[in-house]
């Protein structure tokens, strides 16, 4: 059984399957027009485990996914960084995401357990990752 845990919620096997089904429903058209491809969770974990441990332990480190999709890499970062830091600190000070598709940003925030009251809410934004100014503040314009 696959269970992923964040600081505020659990993602059960059923929830993971629901997310997979949603992605399939997006259809080939969206993939053709946007080039949208999601990195599988197991590959995200392998990539994050390649980050040097001293960087993972650094409470001042920042991690950016400039094409975050629905948050696979961000969720994996949250899981691994929470082994070293308080999950609130990870969400509010360490991880950042940008994606062009608004529904992906919404899903990523939900998967991270973010609410509009959280500082980290403003660290996952809907924007063009190639032209965004990369200033993550509480008043996004």
What are these model-derived regions, one by one?
Residues 2-141:
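SAM-dependent methyltransferase catalytic region
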């Amino acid at each position: 059984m696959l269970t992923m845990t964040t600081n505020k919620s659990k993602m059960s096997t059923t929830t993971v399957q629901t997310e997979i089904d949603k992605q399939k429903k997006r259809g080939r058209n969206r993939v053709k027009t946007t080039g949208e491809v999601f990195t599988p969770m197991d590959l995200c974990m392998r990539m994050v485990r390649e980050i040097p441990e001293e960087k993972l332990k650094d409470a001042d480190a920042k991690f950016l996914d400039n094409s975050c999709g629905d948050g696979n890499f961000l969720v994996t970062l949250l899981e691994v960084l929470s082994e070293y830091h308080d999950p609130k600190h990870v969400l509010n000070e360490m991880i950042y995401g940008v994606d062009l598709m608004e529904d992906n940003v919404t899903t990523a925030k939900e998967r991270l357990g973010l609410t509009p009251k959280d500082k980290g809410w403003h660290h996952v934004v809907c924007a063009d990752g190639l032209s965004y100014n990369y200033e993550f503040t509480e008043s996004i314009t």
